[in-house]
């Protein structure tokens, strides 16, 4: 009934297994990949013919983490998996980026890759297992896929690269100073296709070494997928890349010179209008048959690419006339919004970001319910890309995959320089509103985010800047590396290489390669050129701000205090009664954790002090021999009970009230009367013993009144 094919190798410290033929047999390709006890099922299906009029490749990658994989029940009202989490969206993009360029050009059949996490051992992150499973499923599916690829994660600790570090070591690098890198690399047998990383000011050489280590480490996995395919692959789908060479020559003859003139226009919107006019002019000179050719749009795009690429490689000339290593003009401004906690407007050429920082308290932390546990994040970065930023009227709604991915890239770049939570107990939310875009808006978010946080008073370890690099690589091996690429250079080039960091080193690196043949020499040169660009941008940013400014008067102030853990119950009170009273009386927000760390937040310093004093009076212990002011709360035959230390009561025995004999305490005391008392000590049962007779009741000083 089943035709099961199973292959396995020892990979790092775990066994990697690939299995097909047992489940999802109606899919074009189905593979379950298992690393340790983490298992991911990848299923591939593709249409056998394209939809009419389709002018792009409709590839969809889905990644879903099932809660049952870790023995958990989903939260929420419906108790089932719903919309994709940020992790699921980012992982889907992580898988999509290296496989998309490897489909045969011209293939426009609808293709679906679905990755489902079936089991999670809480040690091995399922994202890389999913990438391997997806690659294996594509390889055996018969789809025109020029893989396989494989991926791995690399850490960097004590100068050593670590293959597939445990998930607990990687999910919060800011609080794990020994681990300085979280790098994901995907590639084929011969080339690196994709890099994604979060780093702690690593040098260019260290980053390049990590990429090489990763590419070497995935070779056994690629061999394993090939071994599986030799026994389980389906017949290749009969698809030939369309030959539109004659059509392209006709398009080139009709429009190359005019297209070159159009691409000499520096203004983006004018250039786009001119390019559109050239395309329409080309179409007017084509035959009816050529106009109906489904490859016409591809031929026109190839004409654009040819013009741009030849100018870069042969003439060293770019669309806007810049040198290959030249950064566009930069204007950095801070304090652009009066009521926000911190704001910056970062403009680089025709790319602009309005970035705003808001400071919050512990109540504002983001709660994350992940397969490997629940945790909180006190740094949030949200990236918004409205249609008007590119002069279009389009969809407005919740963030898409691209916005989530760009936001996470900027988050990785900036979180490495944030102060420790113990030194800066605030929740920081950064929002990047892209108001203009012509390439590298995510890096504008990094620069603007750094400026905005410093404007808000966040004591960053160092300013951070980012730059997007591009590459044009010709068949003869000649190439040009571009600094600070425009949107057209991104779309028509062979590599998108984003690097962010401080003067000391790299904090984030993202690379997407569309072609094979990117050598280590090219990558090394690109990183060095990116460093020069980054340092230039940092110098321009320094004209606006170089260090954390003063807090906005509208931002909350937070004071922290540590109390003994056995006092937490007293501060909270029965049903939260005490802490609610503190909040109501003081007007401050009060947050307490299981370690006894209390955060008191308010824009008003007096509110913070009042809450601090109230908490201190609850948790502090009265000192023997000290004098305190108190209030008589109850009179009995043998003395008086005095409330003298917050809510603490003690007994003043009748013999300790005055230096003379009293018939009854009520002879000299009444309930509600304020008195001065001295703490004599505690009896065997811990009861407080107080005295009045040795304290001057007028001055509160030691020594009875005459």
Swiss-Prot record:
Subcellular location: Cytoplasm
Main location: cytoplasm
Location of the S1 motif domain: 625-693
Cofactor(s) needed by this chain: Mg(2+)
Reactions listed under catalytic activity: RNA(n+1) + phosphate = RNA(n) + a ribonucleoside 5'-diphosphate
InterPro entries linked to this entry: ExoRNase_PH_dom1 (IPR001247), ExoRNase_PH_dom2 (IPR015847), ExoRNase_PH_dom2_sf (IPR036345), KH_dom (IPR004087), KH_dom_type_1 (IPR004088), KH_dom_type_1_sf (IPR036612), NA-bd_OB-fold (IPR012340), PNPase (IPR012162)
PROSITE patterns reported for this sequence: KH_TYPE_1 (PS50084), S1 (PS50126)
Ranges where the KH domain occurs: 556-615
Family note: Belongs to the polyribonucleotide nucleotidyltransferase family.
Protein name (record): Polyribonucleotide nucleotidyltransferase
Annotated source species: Jannaschia sp. (strain CCS1)
Classification of source organism: Bacteria, Pseudomonadati, Pseudomonadota, Alphaproteobacteria, Rhodobacterales
